[in-house]
Amino acid sequence: MQQQKIRIRLKAFDYRLIDQSAAEIVDTAKRTGAIVRGPVPLPTRIQRFDILRSPHVNKTSRDQLEIRTHQRLMDIVDPTDKTVDALMKLDLPAGVDVEIKLQ
């Protein structure tokens, strides 16, 4: 018989928020008796943009900006009903995107 698994993927621009959210999820799952694998840090996605400083001339003078998207992945193996209820009631910060898949 195959075990049920919940895969949680977190995305955020601030690594402190994502680590705090991952710790809350792990604590909640362990309190209800589930086995947690992770959080596994996935590669940070870096988007870089070059913007002209001057609207008229000086093409060589540019600003460089970047957006870093941090990601964490964790699996909750063989969750109970209490685990699912506790995760649904969990209040996470606004800057964290949570993607949950049942496998």
UniProtKB/Swiss-Prot annotation:
PROSITE patterns: RIBOSOMAL_S10. It holds the Pfam family Ribosomal_S10. The keyword GTP-binding does not apply. InterPro entries: Ribosomal_uS10 (IPR001848), Ribosomal_uS10_CS (IPR018268), Ribosomal_uS10_dom (IPR027486), Ribosomal_uS10_dom_sf (IPR036838). The keyword GTP-binding does not apply. Keywords: Ribonucleoprotein, Ribosomal protein. GO terms for biological process: translation. GO terms for cellular component: ribonucleoprotein complex; ribosome. Gene3D superfamilies: Ribosomal protein S10 domain. GO terms for molecular function: structural constituent of ribosome; tRNA binding. Part of the 30S ribosomal subunit. Belongs to the universal ribosomal protein uS10 family. Involved in the binding of tRNA to the ribosomes. This is Small ribosomal subunit protein uS10. It comes from Burkholderia multivorans (strain ATCC 17616 / 249).
